[in-house]
Amino acid sequence: MKKFLWIAFLSFCFSGVAAESDWNADSVQVYFSRSVTPVIQKNWKDHKLILKTYRRFLKICESVPDSVLKQCSWCFIDTYYNVACCESLMKRKKAAVDAFEKAIQYGYYDYAHAQKDSDLDNVRDDKRFQKAMERLREVGDFGYILRKSPGYDDAASTDSLP
């Protein structure tokens, strides 16, 4: 019965918003926080339902103008990263890596988190995932970026630092 009520609730939410023609960054973010986030929080172990919810969100966003999408890229960063995690947990490597690459494409940069996130353990041996992690390191591993920068002296004394 609970599942039926959730499905009915989601259908109601998605039908109302999908018909909306005046999308802006605020309406996308409000939709995400009211229609996506509660489902994820309540059903965080139901990977199929989570994927379905995220895919509906992405489907709706296909009709949103690019200018609006750029203003709320965090929604897509979170969505694609979490889709990658769900797909990995469900042992669907190709789909997981595809979603992970999309997260990076939209601006995901938390290299340290991706490196230790156990949800991604099933794809760590995938060559595409490893290449994506290398690309991510270039923008998200701040120690690595600092060490590569001109003038960085690894042997410099740090005694005077607080």
What name fits each language-model region?
Residues 20-23, 43, 59-73:
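Flexible helix-coil transition and linker loops at the boundaries of alpha-helical arrays
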